[in-house]
């Protein structure tokens, strides 16, 4: 019980108060002005010699508290240039202020947690989205069942604010935040709730990403607690966790109750080979045991979203599949567990035995059809995968055209170098290479054959295929045999922090 008390006090101490005064700190908007905003946004319709002023922020906040803040006469803009109602300026400057203020305490908390765990030096590698694949290669070959889950979006912005309210105790700050969201919803009252959230995410990306990420973080914190204590919980006891305010007190009580009354069933609900992976709004659950426990976790998620977060989910979209028969999509790869069968001959005295050995290996495959669809959308090929010229780039110089294609090819090759089968990757390189040649031929108003014969660009365009070998030769300069082995194997680059647009198929 002392351990839970320490955790409770630690979480309480991390609750940040008095965020409201930070709204009026000029350095907060200086950060927004320097990093995220186009400078013209802050000076539009203002006329302060192209300098933003804290007085603007104070006046905007005052207007939000007024009852008639939505009613602005046509003559107001003539009396004072500031009172000219500019929706983008009004929304963005306040939204950016909210985002920066609310990020400050949680960033400090995150930095301190990294220092406590002593993982500051390896943090850059942990940030890589490809750092999850070595984990999958190590764990998933021993698992049998997988479930692909899409985390549902909240239907209203107020839900996101309520989740944040449990961690930050500052009534004036949340009152102002609610006024801001209420003002936004009124200005877009003709939109459905789903479209309203989509519009808000585009017009206020930083604030929306923080609120959504915090919603996912809160959902995962409850899920991880349930995972750790799953040996003490049964499905009917799950409803006691829905009031977040008394969460930790109930946790202490439940551990005592279940340790006394359900000690005989502890081992039945324990699942040591159960793994969870998430990227953005998509999560993967995998387990070695029978689908019974996977079904229980499926119901846990549904009740958690609907009862605690007021988010409607579709149980029919959550399927439990066998890893050996089905693949799952994550981070631009189709992954599944492949069975490798080999026969070993063993001889003992006069007898000879043939032993069949079955080993499992995680296969990561490049999804060639979605990538061709993305390349067709970007006008590099048609829907069948036949390369076409990029006519929009025909006005650039030959060097710029080749450099653009090489950059795209380099990024895709860098990203998909972890594929088990390189054939699809070579096809993508071929499409980009031929599209580059057709673009150059279109620029010079010639056919592909005539252009190559006249300019002799074949050697230059070979960089599409030789660049990967050059990178490996820099990493392993004296090991030619190592290069030959690595050429057909998977290599995960831990400097990839995000995927490009051609990889985002969903």
UniProtKB/Swiss-Prot annotation:
Role description: Usually encoded in the trnK tRNA gene intron. Probably assists in splicing its own and other chloroplast group II introns.
Disulfide topology: none
Any one Gene Ontology cellular component term annotated for this protein: chloroplast
Family named by the database record: Belongs to the intron maturase 2 family. MatK subfamily.
Keyword line: Chloroplast, mRNA processing, Plastid, RNA-binding, tRNA processing
Keyword Heme: no
Protein localization: Plastid, Chloroplast
UniProt-listed GO biological process terms: mRNA processing; RNA splicing; tRNA processing
Pfam families xref list: Intron_maturas2, MatK_N
Name the UniProt record assigns to this protein: Maturase K
Example GO molecular function: RNA binding
Record carries keyword tRNA processing: yes
Gene: matK
């Amino acid at each position: 019980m002392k351990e839970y008390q320490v955790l409770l006090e630690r979480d309480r101490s991390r609750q940040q108060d008095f965020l409201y005064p930070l709204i009026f700190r000029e350095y907060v908007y200086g950060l927004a002005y320097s990093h995220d905003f186009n400078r013209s946004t802050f000076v539009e319709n203002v006329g302060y010699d192209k300098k933003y002023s804290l007085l603007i922020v104070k006046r905007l906040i005052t207007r939000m508290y007024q009852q008639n803040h939505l009613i602005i006469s046509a003559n107001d803009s003539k009396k004072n240039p500031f009172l000219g109602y500019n929706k983008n300026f009004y929304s963005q400057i306040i939204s950016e202020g909210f985002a920066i203020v609310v990020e400050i305490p949680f960033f400090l908390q995150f930095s301190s947690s990294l220092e406590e765990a002593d993982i500051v030096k390896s943090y850059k590698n942990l940030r890589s989205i490809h750092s999850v694949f070595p984990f999958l290669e190590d764990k998933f070959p021993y698992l049998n069942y997988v479930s692909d889950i899409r985390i549902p979006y909240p239907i209203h912005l107020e839900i996101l604010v309520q989740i944040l309210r449990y961690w930050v105790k500052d009534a004036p700050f949340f009152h102002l935040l609610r006024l801001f969201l209420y003002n936004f919803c009124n200005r877009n009252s003709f939109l459905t709730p789903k479209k309203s959230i989509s519009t808000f995410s585009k017009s206020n990306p930083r604030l929306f990403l923080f609120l959504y990420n915090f919603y996912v973080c809160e959902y995962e914190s409850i899920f991880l607690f349930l995972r750790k204590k799953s040996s003490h919980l049964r499905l009917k006891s799950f409803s006691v966790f829905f009031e977040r305010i008394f969460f930790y007190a109930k946790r202490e009580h439940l551990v005592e109750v279940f340790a006394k009354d359900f000690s005989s069933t502890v081992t039945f609900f324990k699942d040591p080979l159960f793994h969870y992976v998430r990227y953005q709004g998509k999560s993967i659950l995998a387990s070695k045991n029978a689908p019974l426990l996977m079904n229980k976790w499926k119901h846990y998620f549904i009740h958690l979203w609907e009862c605690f977060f007021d988010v409607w989910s579709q149980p029919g979209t959550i399927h439990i599949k066998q890893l050996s028969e089905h693949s799952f999509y994550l981070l631009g790869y189709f992954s599944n567990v492949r069975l490798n069968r080999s026969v070993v001959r063993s001889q003992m005295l006069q007898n000879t035995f043939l032993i069949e050995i079955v080993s499992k290996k995680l296969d990561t495959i490049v999804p060639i059809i979605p990538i061709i669809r993305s390349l067709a959308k970007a006008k590099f090929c048609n829907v069948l995968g036949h390369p076409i010229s990029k006519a929009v780039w025909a006005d650039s110089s030959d060097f710029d055209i080749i450099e653009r294609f090489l950059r795209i090819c380099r990024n895709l090759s860098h990203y998909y170098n972890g594929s088990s089968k390189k054939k699809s990757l070579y096809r993508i390189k071929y499409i980009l290479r031929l599209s580059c040649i057709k673009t150059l031929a279109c620029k010079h108003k010639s056919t592909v054959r005539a252009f190559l014969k006249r300019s002799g660009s074949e050697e230059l365009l070979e960089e599409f295929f030789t660049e990967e070998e050059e990178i490996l030769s820099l990493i392993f300069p004296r090991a030619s045999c190592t290069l030959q082995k690595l050429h057909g194997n998977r290599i995960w680059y831990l400097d990839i922090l995000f995927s490009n647009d051609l990889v985002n198929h969903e």
